[in-house]
């Protein structure tokens, strides 16, 4: 029979995991409390939190959400989970930047919007620009050909108007001179 405190802790972890749109698993062995506090301070403004978890309890919680995914590999050794409630790519970038400064922080992998990623894939995803930048690039890519098309269709009409305007001005000059 599980202890009530552990049941409650599993439920808390489950709720955090359920509310997050991304979970990033890291190993923090060797990092000081000050280092972890600094890391938490960097990701807090990005709508994320970094928590050290007990592997068995976290695994019980995550199996409720992803029962068919092989996630045991993320819960070996000291584990911390970054819960991302906003844009996960900004948080990933902050974590990767922090890991460059603090080599003891190791990525284990992650789950982003329901997809499981390895440690290397998580690091690659961190290289992507933020969602807003990607969206603006897509809009730009879509609108550029349309703008060219509009200009191409408008050009002959503009040329005709300019020609007619030039003819009208020329006739006006001739009528003034007579």
UniProtKB/Swiss-Prot annotation:
Pfam families: Ribosomal_L10 (PF00466). Keywords: Ribonucleoprotein, Ribosomal protein, RNA-binding, rRNA-binding. One of its GO terms (cellular component) is ribonucleoprotein complex. GO terms for biological process: translation. It comes from the Bacteria. Coiled coil: none annotated. Gene3D superfamilies: 3.30.70.1730, 6.10.250.290. The keyword Ubl conjugation does not apply. GO terms for molecular function: large ribosomal subunit rRNA binding. PANTHER family: 39S RIBOSOMAL PROTEIN L10, MITOCHONDRIAL (PTHR11560). Belongs to the universal ribosomal protein uL10 family. Part of the ribosomal stalk of the 50S ribosomal subunit. The N-terminus interacts with L11 and the large rRNA to form the base of the stalk. The C-terminus forms an elongated spine to which L12 dimers bind in a sequential fashion forming a multimeric L10(L12)X complex. Forms part of the ribosomal stalk, playing a central role in the interaction of the ribosome with GTP-bound translation factors. This is Large ribosomal subunit protein uL10. It comes from Dictyoglomus thermophilum (strain ATCC 35947 / DSM 3960 / H-6-12). The gene is rplJ.
